Each structure stands twice: as structure tokens, then as C-alpha cells.
Amino acid sequence: TIINVKCTSPKQCVPACKAAMGTVRAKCINGKCKCYI
């Protein structure tokens, strides 16, 4: 699931994905965070 959080590295997405979806599996794709459940 892509969330509306800008990123330059996957590490920036981990807290955002954890807060949004309760998962720490995250990637940064095209400058946006993508969370995996």
C-alpha cells in the first residue's frame, strides 16, 4: 500500500508504515513510501 509520505530511503518509511498500518516492512518507491502487510 502506498502512503502519502515522501521519502529518499526505506528507513524513513518504517516509522510511517508502523504508525499507519502497523507494519515495519517498508520500501521507498518513486519518492513515496510503500508499506507491506
Curated annotation (Swiss-Prot):
Tissue: Expressed by the venom gland.
Domain of life: Eukaryota
Subcellular location: Secreted
Disulphide bonds in the chain: C7-C28, C13-C33, C17-C35
Cellular component terms (Gene Ontology): extracellular region
Primary subcellular site in the record, as a coarse category: secreted
InterPro entries: Scorpion_toxin-like_sf (IPR036574), Scorpion_toxinS_K_inh (IPR001947)
Residues annotated as site: Aromatic residue of the functional dyad: Y36
PROSITE patterns: SCORP_SHORT_TOXIN
Keyword Transmembrane: no
UniProt key word Secreted: yes
Entry text on domains: Has the structural arrangement of an alpha-helix connected to a beta-sheet by disulfide bonds (CSalpha/beta).
Annotated family: Belongs to the short scorpion toxin superfamily. Potassium channel inhibitor family. Alpha-KTx 02 subfamily.
Functional summary from the UniProt entry: Reversibly blocks hKv1.1/KCNA1 (50% inhibition of current at 1 uM). Seems not to be voltage-dependent.
Name the record gives this protein: Potassium channel toxin alpha-KTx 2.14
Phylogenetic lineage: Eukaryota, Metazoa, Ecdysozoa, Arthropoda, Chelicerata
